[in-house]
């Protein structure tokens, strides 16, 4: 029976299966079923109906559907269902003369494969654990064998139909019977459960089995017969439609004929049937004489038919690669049913593995598949995740192909040509030139050759399957390989020409330092696509891709395609030549279109620019360098030339040395320098970054900084101080002294006045200082130009030397170890370092344990006492000092802001050097403190200070730091009001700062104003007033020498006696002012506020200023209208233990009366309250309020004050104070004729809560100790002093009248 077609006719959606006698089945059929020696019911295997359709969709359900991944790899797939069921409704039409004489099983519920394919196309495969079981449609369930029934069918007898191919009526599948014996009358077929997309195998007819049992082929016998045949070139081949994968073709397995075992059951043998070589294509030889006589087709006829089919397929329109893999719906083309076996067998075993492999009974019994399983992924959208997605792949080596034999057919295929996809295990092509832009050729025909080239593919191999030697080779000619060119890097791209684009996977062109030929050395790079590029270079001429395959090609295009990179300091040369190839300027100008300039590397080889040259080169060295420069220029006339002047950009390097410093070129004529800068600007017109290559780093800056400035940039704008250089012990004056303005010699008089400076001689300290027993004062200043400089970015303090005061830029030039810098006046302080100060060195905290002077060079940074070296010990986390001592230069240390606030400062007043003066800046609360301290900053010269003769420039700028000259804001600052004229004002509704003379001869002190402080200050100054930065105490002298001492200094070294009297400082400009007040927003307990209350002067709200300006004068009633209270009085509180007090009004009656009389401020201090004029004040201890305490006692009319310098007294240890009083009180009493005296013992200590206990203990001890004296003792502290100022009363109730004591003290004076 030949050309027999079998079709399921139970429904339009029934599957049509094809079978052949020598059946070639798909890999999926072999993989899904994998059944060997499956027993069949012997009752149904009779002589006349031996061939049963085995594997119909419902006979044996696909076991993969009901197995997880582990079961697929570990268990056998046989014996799934042994109970066949019959169906009586199935009729089969046979398209040949022969009819089977037995019934076949009828599949009652054939699944709709189209619906299944559509389902898996839009849905992903379920998980590994429950593979394909989540689909609940009943249409997928196969009909069990028990429900299948045998049916007979008739076949046409027309002999013309024997060699015809009929178009199938079903759209879902087909089957084709190969040539069979014409003598067969009946045939019984069993359809497997594989999808219709794979050709199923037809079993032999009953006649073939009736001939003899020895005709049955066993595995062993098959191998023997196959070896005897010697080749299968002349064997007739069955024509079978093969289902292949578009990406990873696999080898093909087929069924052998069935055999009947001894127990009466029919078994089925499975073996490999193809050796897929062009010279050796054959089928299974069954050695059956009946079969030999019944074969009708030869292999030559089959090849001829296949060629016709392939030619028909070539006429199809070629779509894109994604569309090529879709199923073709054409039903009119009969040739679509057949595909050449050569194109189907993609995974072909090599000749070494030509021997057929068969399943053995041991593999069945052990239920372990001997082939590997691969879940393959494909871009095909037609049948994702179908039940064929799990297949047995015989040939794992699918990543190699012959070079000369590949031509992939990308025409639309039939619907049965599907791509199996599954994402569980991916076989993915990573890099392949065949996957892009390959034109369609003939159907896949693969030939095995010796030359192979691997295609980069990632594949998962089964551990139990040995790799075969079948390979794929790269085709000889590819229509086109579309490589995406890599764009050039923006920094190096040419603005005028894009000469070459490289393949996407190629390596970058090696950057040769001295070459401009981009084609040079291209051949030396290893390109993985070099073979592909050479094969496809002719086809890719339409693209702008220039690929140099050899050095000869580069030499030919060297001149025409060369790109010149114009650099300022590099000559144009080839990297491989020793001689420099120079182009003329005309040639360079004519090739502007091929000359490019790198935006980032325009000035890559510019010489080094040193802005600090004036500080780092001595005049002698400059002269030597100038001579050297002239000699070098004679030998290198073209070392730096520009193309704009018909010169060539060239800067050679000899012996690896760096380029010459631009600082040397500065000393040429100004004409040459300006011409150089002009040419540089013309050469680089774009605003690109300039690269200055220094010895250590490469600095980048904007192009507009190419001019070499005479002055250094302001140091406050830098992110960090200049890096410290190594200290050079043999540094001479010439190395630092660059010009007269940079001289470090101390000058007197006004800077920049043109007068000759007078150098002074200094006495340098000797030895190593290890202790400081007293605080520093202005008497210790030897080097007045030694300063601390606060850096504005990190607020650290660095040592330096004050060079000069720049009046134009309102700052000072400070020399550091790394150079000089312009610094603001308020950031400069005296370099007053002492033993015990905590400093920072190399990021760690150290304590100064010694000071030493090792050099007498005036240009070395040293402190005000002359020490230039410090001895340091590291401070541990526990606070203890380490044992190791470091000796470092003073210029290498710095101070943190926290340590700066804790240390004692130099005392610049004429008072004695005590702790209170050293820490006086702490008397201001932090909230009201404007800066670290305002009294230590060297200021610029002013006209008012010309007549003051001081020994140093710094101290000259800081004359009488507590006087009004330093503390007030000069009226010259009124000129700056023009800049703020348009600024909105909070003081006036009009929003303008008016000018006038409302506050002429008036002084103001501002405190606790943070929002509109500056605006208020400008407003006062615009109306003629003066703002004092510190309090009113700086306007007075309140300590005076005594005319007669009450104690003998020889016996009391730690006791000092002062005469307190409030008096204006001499030459004061404010004594003749008519009005003074403090401006704030509320009543406070600040020092400025308390000083104003002690003087009896008004404390006013800040709106008093705007009210007076509106009235255009100071109206007297406005003073009381905006007068603020004096503060909280705890003495007026009814409940004294309570924390709160009573707000008391301010009493300014005396001041107000004098103001109405027109008196000036000189007369305003005459009416100071005399509350302590009959008391002898004894102050012991030190604090930051020492100056305020003296001023307050002077305002309260305390005539005499004695200070006892004692260490801090503990509550449990008051003996030192009692012993001092025991010797002092009797002597005072004897000097005052033993009269009744009043003593006020004031504890100038900050002991917090323990102070009250200390006061109570002292009161009791003093009363007991001096009980025999008829004296009055009062022991008080800071809170009492504040309450006395607020309440205008001491709170003492003594029996002795004030007049008696006052007269007694007056007699002593």
UniProtKB/Swiss-Prot annotation:
Compositionally biased intervals (Polar residues): 1-19, 343-352, 491-508
Species of origin: Saccharomyces cerevisiae (strain ATCC 204508 / S288c)
Modified residues (Phosphothreonine): 218, 471, 474
Note: Present with 400 molecules/cell in log phase SD medium.
Protein name stated in the entry: DNA repair protein RAD9
Region (Disordered): 1-39, 280-299, 342-365, 490-512, 636-655, 691-731
PANTHER family: TP53-BINDING PROTEIN 1 (PTHR15321:SF3), TUMOR SUPPRESSOR P53-BINDING PROTEIN 1 (PTHR15321)
Pfam families: BRCT, Rad9_Rad53_bind
Gene3D superfamilies: BRCT domain (3.40.50.10190)
Cited function: Essential for cell cycle arrest at the G2 stage following DNA damage by X-irradiation or inactivation of DNA ligase.
BP GO terms, sorted: DNA damage checkpoint signaling; DNA repair; double-strand break repair; mitotic G1 DNA damage checkpoint signaling; mitotic intra-S DNA damage checkpoint signaling; negative regulation of DNA strand resection involved in replication fork processing; nucleotide-excision repair; positive regulation of transcription by RNA polymerase II
CDD domains in the record: BRCT_p53bp1_rpt1 (cd17745)
